[in-house]
Amino acid sequence: MTHQPQQSPQFFLTAPSPCPYLEGQMERKVFTHLVGDKANEINDLLTQGGFRRSQNIAYRPACELCRACISVRILAGEFKMTRNMRRVWTQNNDLIGRVHKAQPSTEQYALFRDYLDARHRSGGMSDMTVLDYAMMIEDTHVNTQIIEYRKRGPESFISAKGDGELIAVALTDVMADGLSMVYSFFSPHMHDRSLGTYMILDHIQRAHAAGLPHVYLGYWVEGSRKMQYKIRFTPQEHLGPRGWQRFEG
C-alpha cells in the first residue's frame, strides 16, 4: 500500500498560561503547522477563520473561560481617514515604504531591538536574539514580505527608494482577500509621527490599490489598553459566532 502524505492540517492545544492582555486570566491556544505546498491556501483559510500566523505556526485563542479576543479586519475599500489620521498621513509624507523579500538584516534587527527595549521590555519577545529575529522573518512557507519605511532622499522621486535611515518595518502576509499585518515595529524615538497608525494607513492604501478588500489586524481585546487602537480604523468587521459582522465603532 502506498502511503499518502498528510494534506489536512493537524491541530494541537497548548497548556494554560497567563494571559498577556487581561490580568488574572489564563490563555490556551489551538495551533497547526503551515508547511508544504498547501501552506498558502491553508493560511488564507485559517486567517479568514480567526487564526494568526507566527513563523510556520497558525494559532488562535481557545481559552476555556474567556472569549475576549476578537479577530478584526478593516474594509479597505470603504475606509475613510479621520481628521487625526489625515494629519498623521500628511506628517509622514516624507517616508517611502518599499517592499522586500522576507529576509532579515542587521539594520532591521537593530531597530527591532530598540523598539522592544523601549516599548516591550517585559514582554514575551524581549529576549529575542538576532537568530530568533531571523527565524521570525524567514521561517515560513506562505507568501509574505517585508515593507521597510525610510525617509525620502534627493533622488527618491526618480528611484522610488527611501535613502534615509530605517524607521519602521512591517512583516506582511499577502493573501487572496487582503493583507495580514503579522508584526510591525518602529523607532520609539519618533512619538510625534504615530508610526504605528501610519503603517496601518499605508497597508489600507496598498490593499485598496491592489483590489484586496481587507487588512487583517489580528485580535482586539476589549479592556486591554494596548489593543484599543485597532477599533479606530472603521468600517471594519469582527469575527463572531455568526461569522464576520460589520463594526462601525
Swiss-Prot record:
One of its GO terms (cellular component) is cytoplasm. Keywords: Acyltransferase, Cytoplasm, Transferase. InterPro entries: Acyl_CoA_acyltransferase, Asp_Glu_LeuTrfase, N-end_Aminoacyl_Trfase, N-end_Aminoacyl_Trfase_C, N-end_Aminoacyl_Trfase_N. The keyword tRNA processing does not apply. Its main location: cytoplasm. It comes from the Bacteria. One of its GO terms (biological process) is ubiquitin-dependent protein catabolic process via the N-end rule pathway. GO terms for molecular function: arginyl-tRNA--protein transferase activity; leucyl-tRNA--protein transferase activity. It is found in: Cytoplasm. Its EC number is 2.3.2.29. The keyword Phosphoprotein does not apply. It catalyses: N-terminal L-glutamyl-[protein] + L-leucyl-tRNA(Leu) = N-terminal L-leucyl-L-glutamyl-[protein] + tRNA(Leu) + H(+); N-terminal L-aspartyl-[protein] + L-leucyl-tRNA(Leu) = N-terminal L-leucyl-L-aspartyl-[protein] + tRNA(Leu) + H(+). Belongs to the R-transferase family. Bpt subfamily. Functions in the N-end rule pathway of protein degradation where it conjugates Leu from its aminoacyl-tRNA to the N-termini of proteins containing an N-terminal aspartate or glutamate. PANTHER family: ARGININE-TRNA-PROTEIN TRANSFERASE 1 (PTHR21367), ARGINYL-TRNA--PROTEIN TRANSFERASE 1 (PTHR21367:SF1). This is Aspartate/glutamate leucyltransferase. It comes from Brucella anthropi (strain ATCC 49188 / DSM 6882 / CCUG 24695 / JCM 21032 / LMG 3331 / NBRC 15819 / NCTC 12168 / Alc 37). The gene is bpt.
